[in-house]
Regions:
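C-terminal segment of N-terminal export signals and the immediately downstream linker at the start
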Residues: 23-42
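Glycine-rich phosphate/diphosphate-binding loops that line cofactor/substrate pockets in enzymes
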Residues: 37-38, 61-73, 118
């Protein structure tokens, strides 16, 4: 499958780590391993970061509690979809959103070795924004397969789109 913008659109909805590897295969020198799905997966994919007039990621509190349980995690945040602003600012926004749940957010850009960061992550969150930038940067960092392996091993994974869901009034 060609690495094109059209093929990457589904990555936002289905989770970049789950679908990006086959798309990146066109540029990879060796074939990727077939995707194996594990029943251990703990995944939450949100179609938006906001709903109606809610704050950033506010409306998903119940889902986060189901995903993470009572355990408090240090969550590895992947901000690579951010194209306007800084990774630091994006990390802070996500830290503030997860603070009420007791989780600590640390962005992958703070690590010298992003692959090691993914291998050692206890939980992973992928922020929304520009899907092309996200998948390209994940591919360049060599973390797509690693994220899939970690998710299939049962590491909690969440991701979201950047935009707000429309508020459709029923009359």
């Amino acid at each position: 499958m060609a690495l094109t913008r059209r093929n990457l659109i589904s990555a936002t909805i289905l989770g970049a780590a789950a679908v990006a590897a086959p798309m990146a295969q066109a540029k990879q020198k060796t074939p990727l391993k077939p995707m194996k799905v594990s029943p251990k997966r703990r995944v939450l994919i949100q179609s938006s970061s906001r709903y109606h007039n809610s704050g950033y990621l506010d409306f998903a509190g119940d889902q986060y509690e189901k995903l993470f349980g009572k355990e408090k995690y240090e969550i590895l945040f992947i901000p690579y979809a951010k194209v306007a602003g800084t990774y630091d600012a994006y990390e802070k926004q996500v830290q503030d959103a997860f603070k009420p749940y007791g989780h600590k957010i640390v962005s992958i850009h703070r690590f010298k070795d992003p692959q090691k960061a993914v291998r050692e992550a206890k939980a992973i969150a992928v922020g929304g924004g520009n899907t092309w930038a996200l998948v390209t940067r994940m591919y360049e960092a060599g973390i797509i397969d690693l994220i899939r392996e970690r998710v299939n091993a049962g590491v909690p994974y969440c991701g979201w789109r950047q935009r707000r869901l429309p508020d459709v009034a029923h009359h």
